[in-house]
Amino acid sequence: MPLKPFEAIVIGSGATGGVATQTLAEAGIRVLVVESGPDLSAQEALGSEPINSMRRVRGLLSGQHRNQAQHPGYWKHNPRLYADERRYPYSTPKDQPFLWTQGRQVGGRSLTWGGITLRLSDLEFKAAERDGHGHSWPISHQDLDAHYSALERQFAIHGNRDGLAQLPDGCTTAPLSFTPEEQQLAAALQGSADIEMIHSRGFSAHQPSPKCPWPPSSSPGSSLKTALSTGRVEVLSGHLAERLLMNRDRSRASGVVVIDQRNGERIKLEAPLVVLCASTIASLRFLLLSERSATEGGFEDPSASLGRHLMDHVSTCRFFQVPSRSGRASLQELDPTSQLSGAGSFFLPFGSLPPQRSGALPFSRGYGLWGAINRFDPPWWLKRNPDCRLGFLIGHGEVLPSHQNRVTLSETVDRWGVPIPHISCRWGTNETAMVAHMHTLMNEAIALGGGEIQPLTDLVMMPLIEPIVGNLEAMKAGAPPPGYYVHELGGAPMGNDENDSVVDSWNRLWRCPNVLVVDGSCWTTSAWQSPTLTMMAITRRACQQALRPENA
């Protein structure tokens, strides 16, 4: 247990926790990072084959990963990076499944992040002013611009400057090349009046080496590593953050209560600043427990809306094949940068103004289509048509905030006696109409590129696992349940008025300003872009503001 005093406690060590810790430590602040999971080595975290495959089988048979196995990333990464659902349970209504992916280890879900880095535009930040749904954000792109730029430079993000209103340009290095089949699709789409194809923006695929064992997109390979190098950071792993400690008049937090998961002991840790980066649902549970705490008074939420307006991105997927333009040889063996990654892929970035088909759009807000061709092909002898290359398109769209979609505390408690989160979330008519439009544009784009849509199991032979893969949510025609896209957002939104938001424009709890809420829970709307870069930019901005003398 740490004995030295700390000036800040950061809860969570993933994408936002790493940036919070780096920002504070580089400014001279002594930081304690609280992480519920273990501190793994890079070799332990990444794993290897066939051991990872054996762990997947065990995770499925034991029930450890019953829900998380629905996500394609589970089949790509070491299953050890997905929390045991029996140890960290949650509940849902029977008719409202929610697929919560939990990354409980130092590095959190940054170790399984796909590495796409997109900025939000004011079309998203101020969408409510345009259509009247919900509230606009209290910040704009200009407020985050410098923080976006600093992070893009630090991470050496790949991408073009495309000059799109719906996708602001960043400080990027050269984009990764399209595969030959992607080049063919891009050329075919140039004949379309309203379907534009751009290089995706993000990280390239990680190639582990002794010099770079961690993925640069992960906090252990970037922000957290930089923070630890200052000598002002200590990581307390294996401890679950339960709730805030409050002062007598409930105006400020004095620290947090954590649970040592080895023995269940509750420990009080004190610091003048608390930064909450535990991921949306875990952070909402922490805040709900803190709000209701009888022994310490709890903090006040004037809006009485904590936990409400939970969102994810609504998504749907189509697999297809196109004639190979590069023979049967593996492109990835010839060029490792051609592996599927945040930068090794493409976007059809429709944004808030998708092309109209058959009259006015039957939904509000927007979406993008992310895709790739010839970046994840199995060996040619496993393909049903070995002279074709495989592709996919995945839509991810903005979800309207709904008062009914929420996280509450269940009457059921976990092994440490803490109420588990109860998640109530379902798609509405707007999301259903958006998904139908996604299908129309997917079909159109793939047809223009000479592709043929088929179920993945009709494209690839999968000995032994075909029955499992065929039943995955990603294989179904419609939209998977909320949580599937691992972009859960909202529940403690930013705002300009304490009566309709949980945190202010600097991410401070309205009635407890030395607590910052900076992960996805602070989002006012979901936007349509991949959220992680914006989460990190919000975190950097909030932590820099907290360091100013007037906030001491």
Language-model features: locations:
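Conserved N-terminal glycine-rich FAD pyrophosphate-binding loop of Rossmann-like flavoproteins
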Residues: 38-64, 103-112
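Beta1/beta-strand and adjacent pyrophosphate-binding region of the FAD-binding site
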Residues: 2-16
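Conserved hydrophobic helix-helix packing surfaces used for dimerization/oligomerization
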Residues: 8-10, 31, 515
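FAD cofactor-binding and catalytic pocket of flavoenzymes
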Residues: 83-102, 106-109, 113, 119, ...
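A conserved FAD-binding loop/helix module that cradles the flavin
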Residues: 525-543
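Conserved redox-cofactor binding core of oxidoreductases
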Residues: 57-84, 89-99, 104, 114-119, ...
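A glycine-rich dinucleotide-binding beta-alpha-beta segment and adjacent secondary-structure elements
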Residues: 198-215, 237, 242-249, 389-394, ...
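Glycine-rich loop(s) and the adjacent beta-strand/alpha-helix scaffold that form part
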Residues: 23-26, 30-55, 243-247, 256-330, ...
